[in-house]
Amino acid sequence: MKRHLFRLTIGLLMLAVCGWDCLVCGAHPNGSSCNQYRLIEGSTLVDDCTICGRPTLLIPIRGSFYLEPNEIDPLFSNFGVRDLKFTSVGPYWTYSGKLEGTYRMGGEVAVVQQMKLEGIINGIEGLEFDSNLVPLQATFPWIEIDLEQLPPTNPLQTFRLHLVAVAWPTVWFSTEVSFTPSAPGATKVSDGDLLSVTGQVVCTNNQLTGRLGIMPIVPDIGLDAVMWLIPSLHQQKGTPTPEIWFSAERDIFSETLGPLHDGDLLSNAGRIVRTYADLVAKFSPMPPVPDFGLDAITLGPDGKLLFSTEEGFFSEKLGVSISDGDLLCEDGRIFKTIGQLLAKFQPIEPRPIQFGLDAAYVWPSGEVWFSIEADFVDSKWGRIGHGDILSDTGRVVARNSELLAPFGPIEDLADFGLDGLEVFGSVLRADFDQDGNVDFRDYAVLATSWRLNCCTTCPAPDFNCDRKVDFTDLKIFAENWLADVE
């Protein structure tokens, strides 16, 4: 049925939405795709007056851009920087900018980088910036770079940019407390629901637990650890679709599976993936093995399960005490201690803190994104909350308030916590609302962008960043739609 509906609606899209003009639009010859980047905390704009005595203004900024791969020459990887938009953060000054340009990275001996941008800041047009060739300040795909404004400059207002950017993939998470979105008619979001940073509820707690055989009326059992397995990583027979693996926040009884513990790893397909005893078995904790809980779950670079527990314990095999903040591997080794995860941060508290490890995601490179259970004050970043996403590179990837902003909670809380975290580059690029499938809501996004035709920015459906949503993008959308049918 979905196939037939798709064929019909594609025809309607061509004629009713874009009109006959779309039949003469050419496809972009470069089939490369754009990667969305996000300007994170640490990005700043400097507003300086070189001939007067006013203070130099250091303005925190946030924003995003698209990094488009271009040709690779013998020495450099070259990229286009598309649709870089930023706004100021804070109540004192209002700045906004829109820039575009190029970025290259490489070198013959040492690895260097260069970014060139041009555009508008606060209505001032024709601004140009150049970093020149400078050493890397961060390991790619992170980008950290300083850009100076090129002459001619206005001595009364000269700008400089410091950009800290990270590739911003699909991010799912859960909170520690429930909240009410501000959208009219929105229902309360549970601390057991799985959410997307786009402001969507990916999966309610009842949808996650619906096949576990819990006696109705099924209560909300919370959501602690979470991960999403795509088919390329999980090829279990009889499981044709991806599964969400998760842990609950309390014990409950299943009529089909028996007792379910908060330390068990469960599947929305209706099975126990690992019991709490299975997960810690190779660490040889002192018997009898209690339920230590399950706080974080993710896959390591080698495909093995990594996890953290809610309680520490002593490993007879390793001869050490395991902290509730350590990231453990199911093969019986410590992947990273909480000390290693926080090594590049600088807590200023005079007393030891039990940080804990509430959520974690490990990139193929080994970089870890994570959240902790206790707030602390850092000498560089200030207060770090238990709902912030941190990187073991020593950066704050996203504040809890930024994650919740698309929902607009009406509750006045500084931090809603972060219990579960899953990060992945979307398997289906046309999954614009990041709910795990391509459906009519994504189709509506495509149709809306198509009406713009020859757009001046790169909307999500402009897969190849050629500034228009045309048949090349429609082909990719169709492939994603039909792939979601299989």
Explain the meaning of each model-derived region:
Residues I217-L233, P288-T298, P350-V362, D412-G425:
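Signature of short aromatic-glycine-proline-rich micro-motifs recurring in repeat-based ectodomains
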Residues T50-L161:
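Predominantly extracellular/secreted and cell-surface proteins with exposed
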Residues T170-V189, W245-R271, M286, L306-I322, ...:
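Cellulosome-associated attachment modules in secreted, modular CAZymes
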Residues H28-P74, W168-V177:
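N-terminal segment immediately downstream of the Sec signal-peptide cleavage site
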